[in-house]
Amino acid sequence: MFIANLCAVKQVKMYKQQNFLRHFLFLFFFSLLSFQAFCGVIKGTIVDKKTREPLFGATIQVAGTAFGTVADREGRYTLNVDTGTYTLIVKFVGYQDLIREGVKVAENQEIHFELEPDTETLDEVKVTARKNLENERVLQVERQNATIAIENMGAKEMSLKGISNVEEGVKKITGISVANAGQLIVRGLGDRYSTTTLNGLPIASPNPDNKLIPLDLFPSATVKNITVSKVYVVQSFADYSGAHIDIGTKVHTGEDFFSVGMNVGGVFNTLGKDFYYSDREGSLLKTGNIDSKYLDMPYSSFEEKVKEKDIFGTSFVIEKKTALPDFSGNVGWGKSFGKLNVLLSMGAGNEKQILKDAFVKQFTAQGRVLNMFRYNSYITKFKIAALAGLSYTFRHSDYLNYSLFYARNAIDEFMERDGFDSEGVTLRGSNSVYHAYSLLNNQLSGHHEWGERWELNWAGSYGMTGSDEPDRRQVMFRKNENTSKLSLFLLNQQETMRYFGELDENELVGDVKVAYRFGEKNRLHFGATYKRKTRDFRCASFYYNLDNLPSPEIFNIYDTDSYLNFENVANGNILIKRSYQPRNRYKAESKAYAAFAEVDFFPFPTLLINIGVRYEQINQSVDYFDDGSIKRKSELKNGDIFPALNIKYTIGERNSLRFAVSRTVTRPAFVEMAPFLYRESYGSAAIRGNAAIQNGYNINVDLRYDLFSKKNNDMFSATLYFKQLNDPIERVQEAEGGSAVHTFRNSKNGIAMGVEVEMRKEVFKNFRLGLNGSYMYTDVKLPKDGGIYTDNQRALQGASPYLINADISYAPYLRGGDDRMILALVYNVQGPRIHSVGIFGLGDNKQLTLHTLDWVGSYSLGHHWSFKLTVKDLLNSKVRFRQDVPQINDKLEVEAFRPGTNAEIGFTYKF
């Protein structure tokens, strides 16, 4: 043992002796030579026998000893042992153990191992059992043997398809698409019907209009895998009928590593072009919000203070630069200290995009153009994410995990508009918007086993999310139709303005689950969960009264500093009016108490019955001010029981038939249950909640057939589903003060049904086809009283009748397996869907069918270097919207823009 240990560190010891004991150099030289004669090294690779895919995390151990090691990301291992003859044991979850006896170990000996999959040993795999796995084969085995129907995507598949974040990843899963503003649509059901968790625990959303957190906050560099379940299981909260999306962050389990990566690229129609932007306070990590004292001080004091000091620190000037390439980079480090594993990862980047010659129109019910604006949009995105993970293993199978995840996405957009309003006035506009979303999440979890029957899993998390919109600015100019000269538009003092909005949300979660094994495979599960969420929102607008300002000579919309400046504010030529009413802020809280019990029962070996029940008590409240500035409180308290049944019948070794039925709930969001007038941002729709809103309840039925190949990753899956939506919550429009206001009502009923198909096929070695598609039908009946919407019955907003994803990949190993090349084409088609609901006699505004095609190429050179080239949207597709105008029996185009083709090249070096 002494010789083996000294062998593993002999170079380090030699270095220290040379520095501190130089006069004993000769003695130590001979000592090391003598030890060298007894040192042996085994190295090689551990791969999948069929696919040749490296098995990252596979273990190799010397039988009867504590000597062992773990394969790295390339499947490579190095094991230092004494020279001699041994028995080696190679293991990897989901594969048959390989035992090789009589291995004679000498210096620098290479031995390669090929493992065969063994799904029979994984019959008891649960959905939450492998959130730390990346390997596609093992994820397929997990999917095959899971108690409930799931779909998953690992880091390796995300890399192969050029997926940069979780949002792009879930769009490749059957029946899922992403609509405008990042809203997730699953089986035709909108954002409110799904839920998102991080490592199995709920996470809050910083977007008050969306239930789900923006999924592009999670870059692929920090993600181990994504698991999607479209059927309900009672171990989760019952507020989903669309999908439960769990994001598993990476955990260090393999060989120590340090990696550095960098990418450069850009959109073809943006690179090298003139790029316009506005000045900003703050930075990528810090938002330049207005000091709260200027909001809280009396109005008379504010009028004086705003003349004494420039409280904003920014101007309305728009500057110009040349669009340079986009840059991004990431750093990763993982190391094991005995039983303690540490992982650190960080990435940051920026993106720029120009939407040129886009337009948006509004029509009357008679088909006349009410208003129309052409616009150019200049968008800059800043993204940063960091992950720290600690895992500690003790006893035989107990462990503790801690993870800290931080992400921040900021979007800075300048838009110039040119057109006419509903009064026929020709206008030009300058609009600057900055929106930042952030997430800071802490998680601590543990797993403990007692004997062969009892198992305890516990977890806790505390998350903070934020949504800031600091200093949105607008200036509107009137354009003389004859001379094209510009002047400030002075209609009602709202044409030149600033807007500030802040939202902070905190969420605390505690979760305990216990499992008891009885019989050979049967299990009883029970547990409890506590969740508390708080939200604090406020916004303020500042309107510029320009009536006293001498008419300036205006040459363009960019150079405004000669007249829209602090000097004119100080001398009284410009009056700044603050709009910060009590109704501009609200506080909200939600408390959830839940308990569940379920059993996995095998009446006979091929039939699994999972039956369970969950109880949830939800107390939700919103403190707000009504239009008369009177303080109000809106509350919703419900205690409900949610049963679920999941049946799996295994036919032969690779076929299975699954059936699921459950009852779930759809709860109103905070802003939907409080009847105050609210705008999430300036220019967005006015929203008024409904104090009479109630929960909606859903009955979900799924039938699925799965076929998995015994030899490789080939598979086929087909699913039929039906959902009965009782009292569904729908966003509707009502007339208020001569204009449309969005509100929320319980509709009569709705349905969603469809079929999903998925397949993967290896045509020949290293050449693979993938395809998934869905066809769906949705229908909802709206209340006939009070609304100004044109149709009382329609498809669900955001639902496409069909979705298709396809990919072709070729991934051979070269140079004797040292190198690997990957070439892939990834295609997506999204059918037409309702973008906005038609009102005042107009039909629905629909986004037309959209096709996208991406190309991904990568090359791994030896142990250290890898290179990648990605081209997204090869078709340079145009996004188009058309609205039905029933009175003239026509469909008119109301908006169109072209995002542009994007290319990126990058490299990664692993030390």
Where are these regions (language model features)?
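Short, acidic Ser/Thr/Gly-rich low-complexity loop/linker segments typical of extracellular
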Residues: T65-R76
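Transmembrane beta-barrel wall of Gram-negative outer-membrane proteins
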Residues: F312-M415, S438-L444, W450-G451, L645
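Periplasmic N-terminal accessory/gating domains of Gram-negative outer-membrane beta-barrel systems
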Residues: N132, V141-I185, G200-V234, S241
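Short, acidic, small-residue-rich periplasmic hinge/interaction motif at the N-terminus
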Residues: V47, T59-Q61, K91-V93, A106, ...
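Outer membrane beta-barrel strand-and-loop segments of large Gram-negative receptors
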Residues: L491, R498-Y499, L503, V509-D511, ...
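C-terminal beta-signal and adjacent terminal beta-strands/loops
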Residues: V829-S836, S858-F911
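Surface-exposed extracellular loop regions of Gram-negative outer-membrane beta-barrel proteins
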Residues: L201-P202, A410-D412, G466-D468, S487, ...
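Gram-negative outer-membrane beta-barrel transporters
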Residues: Y721-Q724, T743-I834
